[in-house]
Amino acid sequence: YAAIPAHPQKQYTRRWCLYHFCGSCYPIREVIPIAIYHCNISIVSRGKGKSAVAAAAYRSGEKITNEWDGMTHDYTRKRGVVHTEILLPPHAPPSFSDRATLWNSVELYEKAGNAQLAREIDAALPIELSREEQIRLVREYCSSQFVSRGMCVDFAIHDTDKGNPHCHIMLTMRPLDERGAWAAKSKKEYDLDENGERIRLPSGRYKTHKIDLT
């Protein structure tokens, strides 16, 4: 494969190139560098008055009721939703292929009023790619980076008459364990000294740090 040039050039040969998307490379047929790069990562937090169900309903252009608070979010009139898809790890419950079931499971599992419910990636897509290539690009990126780690992915591709294709990728904050149940977001590990021994703090407790699992 040939890497994509860092800057636009006048001529391109017909070949397979590597397209850089959100820090990863994917082979796509005859790609031209994207005109305007955009990629934003954010957290859907209940503490900020947001909900995963509302976000999923808006991104997909659907009507979904949040079982956590009883609110119904209807975005069926939203324009520009050209593709939606849910990607699940092999051990996920089959019912999670339904958008309402997936995100209501997340909402009901998280009890805290300030819970972090989902992670979202908003990224521009190259207009030079066909719709099928745009979908494949996002699907392969999500499968390799997130589904392989046990996370559930709900992505949507939006486009309007102005020609601004972009994707919204929603990720579960928790991975699924081998039984298909929600697992911990992070795990605790002990800090070790140069001899491999646990470091004890003045309080008598051992020094630890958290490792994010997603």
Please provide the spans of the model-predicted regions.
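Charged/polar low-complexity intrinsically disordered segments
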Residues: 4-9
